Amino acid sequence: MKTPELITDPAAWQARCTAAREAGTRIALVTTMGYLHEGHLSLMREARRRADAGGRRGLAVGTIFVNPTQFGPTEDLARYPRDLEGDLAKCAAAGLDAVLAPSDPALMFAPGHETWVTVERASQGLDGASRPGHFRGVATVVAKLFNLTRPHVALFGEKDWQQLAVIRAMVRDLAFGIEIVGMPIVREPDGLALSSRNAYLSPDERRRALALSGALAEAREATARGERDAAALRAGARARLEAAGGRVDYVELVHPETLAPVARAEPGTVLLLAASFGTTRLIDNGRLP
């Protein structure tokens, strides 16, 4: 198992990726904030496969950067879990060739940085309402990583459904020419969606957080029985979360592409959930049948 090349300087990373692309190498990218779990690794394994899809070995790469610009002033930037050594071992097992892990946030956002990417419609509501400025930070750092890496394909998890919509809109509107691939949510055997923030949960909070996947399962069962009224489905999901002691941020049924709220759940409608258990805010989602 080969250890991936670790690059800590974005300029050196850009030179490395530019040389590879100019040599005709296909590049696949996975962006992360580190503290990797099986959800991230599923993206990296798929990046390896897609990088090599052209008939020759490509370049499968990842980034590890806890982006300060996507955290609000009261959020968990300082305590966000970090384990670079462990992450690199996982990247090696997943088959990555190289990893960018900037040694200083100022290398990505220098003093005087004044350029931001705002995706208007997709950033509104949901996490955009609960976390002002979050998607501006996400879109800006992803745009910068795209410019530094110039990948042919980039992979993102569907657990962050709104984030995926934001990135797809940005790539479309700014003509990045990158294929964006959304990958399914990876769950624990008991249904909890994998998240780096699960590390914050106490055993009791983790048990109660299973209400997220439980609410999704109940909504699927209800629609399978013929319930299509969005208000009724929202009410059922909210009740499940509140019964488990969750502090509900939002429960919404939306069109899978536009994120527009719907009055009636059609096949493929997405149920989006956000709730806190203890001090840990978690999100989850699922398509309805």
UniProtKB/Swiss-Prot annotation:
* Claim: Ligase is one of the keywords in the record: yes
A GO CC annotation recorded here is:
cytosol
**Active-site residues per Swiss-Prot or TrEMBL entry:** H40 (proton donor)
Q: Which InterPro entries match?
A: Pantoate_ligase, Pantoate_ligase_C, Rossmann-like_a/b/a_fold
**The name this protein goes by in its record:** Pantothenate synthetase
Q: What is its EC number?
A: 6.3.2.1
Briefly, what is this protein's role? Catalyzes the condensation of pantoate with beta-alanine in an ATP-dependent reaction via a pantoyl-adenylate intermediate.
Q: What are the protein's UniProt keywords?
A: ATP-binding, Cytoplasm, Ligase, Nucleotide-binding, Pantothenate biosynthesis
